[in-house]
């Protein structure tokens, strides 16, 4: 169905940190929402790129050669195979 998906409503349905929830699927891709605070492990994805979009708050992503910051309304594409470690000092989604 072509019904709008309300992010605020979807975020209100869970509290777990670092536990992505699938909200839609398209072709071979899943759209996920996640709440974060603190650090995640350094990792990579061998088969696919990964997109981070910040709806509220801010986060950083550490790469091997730099650290970037994403603020509310910003996004970044992490290329497949690129090692990265996402983290957020305060509650972010």
Task: Please name every model-derived segment.
Residues 92-93:
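Conserved small/polar residues in nucleotide/adenosyl-binding loops
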Residues 36, 46-60:
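Short, conserved beta-strand element in jelly-roll/cupin
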Residues 30-46:
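Conserved short histidine dyad/triad with adjacent acidic residue
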Residues 27, 55-56, 72:
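A cytosolic small-molecule/anion-sensing beta-strand core signal
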Residues 1-32:
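A short, N-terminal "cap"/entry segment at the start of jelly-roll beta-barrel domains
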Residues 27, 62-66:
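Short strand-coil-strand connectors
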Residues 65-80:
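Short acidic-glycine-tyrosine-enriched beta hairpin
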Residues 43, 61-62, 78, 83-89:
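Short beta-strand His + acidic residue motifs that chelate non-heme Fe in jelly-roll/DSBH
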């Amino acid at each position: 169905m072509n019904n709008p998906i309300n992010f605020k409503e979807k975020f209100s349905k869970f509290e777990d940190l670092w536990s992505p929830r699938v909200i839609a699927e398209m072709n071979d891709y899943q759209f996920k929402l996640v709440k974060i605070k603190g650090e995640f492990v350094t990792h990579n994805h061998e088969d696919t790129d990964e997109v981070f979009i910040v709806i509220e708050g801010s986060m950083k992503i550490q790469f091997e050669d730099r650290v970037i910051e994403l603020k509310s309304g910003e996004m970044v594409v992490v290329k497949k195979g690129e090692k990265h470690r996402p983290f957020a000092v305060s509650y972010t989604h």
